[in-house]
Structure formats: structure tokens, C-alpha cells
């Protein structure tokens, strides 16, 4: 019973990974649209896009860490 609850909890914790994937897609989609409109700002916008990617990916890594904690620690 407890093992099944752990698996369900870990699966629920990984739902955030799908949201992070959508967020990363939005970051780079916005980058492509912005560079297409104003190519002279490409270098500056790329820095902002990498920052957005890193922050979004951090949320995904925290969610994955929670899933592993649920599976192997509790």
C-alpha cells in the first residue's frame, strides 16, 4: 500500500516537468519572434533567453528532485 502511494506521489511530482517543457518552448519561441522583428538586438535577447531557460529548467530540476526524494527517501 505504501509503495503504491509513493509511486503515485512521484508521478504527480513529475507533472511539473511537462509545464517546464512548455515554458522552455515559450522562451525560445519568443526569442525567435523577437530576433525576426529586430535582428540588431539578437545578442542581448539571447542572454535574456538563456536566463529564462535557466530559471525554467531550475523549476523542472526541483520537481525531479522531489520525485526522487519521494521514491527513495520516504
UniProtKB/Swiss-Prot annotation:
- Name where it mostly resides: mitochondrion
Residue ranges spanning the membrane: these are: 8-28, 53-73
What domain of life does the UniProt record list for this protein's source? Eukaryota
A GO-annotated cellular component: mitochondrion
Q: Where is this site: Reversibly protonated during proton transport?
A: 57
* Single GO term (MF): ATP binding
What is the topology of this protein in the membrane according to its UniProt annotation? Answer: Multi-pass membrane protein
The entry's localization annotation reads: Mitochondrion membrane
UniProt keyword list: ATP-binding, CF(0), Hydrogen ion transport, Ion transport, Lipid-binding, Membrane, Mitochondrion, Nucleotide-binding, Transmembrane, Transmembrane helix, Transport
Q: How does this polypeptide assemble, per the annotation?
A: F-type ATPases have 2 components, CF(1) - the catalytic core - and CF(0) - the membrane proton channel. CF(1) has five subunits: alpha(3), beta(3), gamma(1), delta(1), epsilon(1). CF(0) has three main subunits: a, b and c.
HAMAP family linked: ATP_synth_c_bact
Name of the protein in question: ATP synthase subunit 9, mitochondrial
Native source organism of the sequence:
Oryza sativa subsp. indica
Amino acid at each position: 500500500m505504501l509503495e503504491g502511494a509513493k509511486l503515485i506521489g512521484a508521478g504527480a511530482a513529475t507533472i511539473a516537468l511537462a509545464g517546464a517543457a512548455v515554458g522552455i518552448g515559450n522562451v525560445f519561441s519568443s526569442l525567435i519572434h523577437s530576433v525576426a522583428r529586430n535582428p540588431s538586438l539578437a545578442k542581448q535577447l539571447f542572454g535574456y533567453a538563456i536566463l529564462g531557460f535557466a530559471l525554467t529548467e531550475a523549476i523542472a530540476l526541483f520537481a525531479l528532485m522531489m520525485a526522487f526524494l519521494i521514491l527513495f527517501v520516504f
